[in-house]
């Protein structure tokens, strides 16, 4: 960051934590107090979702390394119909490892939370196994992120069919961009699909990139101004589905389905 205090997003590489003995020390020295680690259930399932054998074991090693360096681990777990029973075992594992007690010893609290994640980008592929709200294990309800705001897809559709507003992807005062190694640029709140691409720094130039950002002139932002949530729910919603969504995640799911179709037309 330039001329301001750096922002910390509590994200770090667990791959590097277990391979670089200086990495945790570096994190501590720059003021990191909590690092989030992501599970997808038990060992085999977590390895498969992450795409690397041994990933689950590395997450547990990273947990130990963080604690040894005065940094609290925070566990999150993504839940779906396939892994719900495995995810239900994670609080027991945290208790077995005495993570709450050990975090208190370093002046922090241990946090574990569960959610289904958004349903855009790669997560769209998991829609068929998205968790049914009534199938969420009761033991996980206290850990479920914003459970009180969770709805079924049917409830989301019913609500949005009455909504004449457009999806709002206008820029706020603070804009964060993702820039790839080939200089393509996206907003950080989207996934990196062609529909959301702002442009290319080398091909389009900084002035044109800034114009597109300031004028909100990207394919996705233009399309958002042309359609209402009621239209999205009518075209793409499943009024019989009991899949669990927050209303915000469901709005994003519908709009991205629409974007994908419009972009391919």
Regions found by a protein language model. Give the residues of each.
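Short, flexible coil/linker elements and helix-boundary hinge sites characteristic
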Residues: 21-22, 98, 236-237
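Flexible mid-to-C-terminal extensions adjoining Fe-S/redox cofactors in radical SAM and related proteins
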Residues: 184-265
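Alpha-helix C-terminal capping segments
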Residues: 1-4, 134-136, 248
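Radical SAM enzyme [4Fe-4S]-AdoMet core and its adjacent flexible, acidic
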Residues: 33-34, 40, 48-181, 186, ...
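Alpha-helix boundary recognition
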Residues: 28, 67, 95, 211-214
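Conserved SAM/AdoMet-binding glycine-rich loop
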Residues: 1-38
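A generic secondary-structure micro-motif detector
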Residues: 12-13, 52, 80, 209
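Short, charged, surface-exposed secondary-structure boundary motifs
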Residues: 21, 45-47
């Amino acid at each position: 960051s330039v001329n301001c205090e750096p922002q910390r997003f509590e994200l770090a590489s667990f791959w590097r934590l277990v391979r670089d003995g200086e990495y945790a020390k570096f994190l501590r020295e720059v003021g990191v107090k909590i690092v989030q680690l992501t599970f997808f259930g038990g060992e085999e399932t977590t390895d498969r979702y992450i795409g690397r054998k041994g990933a689950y074991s590395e997450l547990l090693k990273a947990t130990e390394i963080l604690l040894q360096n005065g940094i609290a681990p925070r566990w999150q777990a993504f839940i779906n119909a396939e892994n719900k029973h495995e995810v239900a075992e994670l609080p027991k594992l945290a208790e077995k490892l005495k993570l709450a007690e050990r975090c208190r010893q370093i002046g922090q609290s241990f946090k574990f939370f569960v959610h289904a994640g958004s349903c855009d980008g790669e997560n769209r592929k998991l829609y068929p196994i998205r968790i049914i709200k009534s199938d969420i294990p009761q033991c996980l309800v206290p850990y479920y992120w914003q459970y009180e705001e969770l709805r079924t897809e049917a409830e989301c559709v019913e609500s949005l069919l009455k909504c004449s507003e457009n999806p709002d992807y206008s820029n706020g005062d603070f804009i964060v961009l993702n820039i790839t190694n080939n200089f393509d640029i996206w907003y950080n709140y989207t996934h990196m699909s062609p529909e959301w691409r702002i442009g290319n720094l080398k091909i389009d130039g900084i002035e044109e990139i800034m114009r597109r950002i300031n004028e909100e002139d990207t394919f996705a932002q233009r399309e958002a101004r042309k359609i209402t949530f009621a239209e999205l729910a009518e075209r793409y919603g499943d009024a019989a589905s009991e899949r669990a969504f927050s209303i915000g995640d469901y709005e994003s799911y519908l709009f991205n389905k629409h974007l994908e179709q419009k972009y391919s037309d």
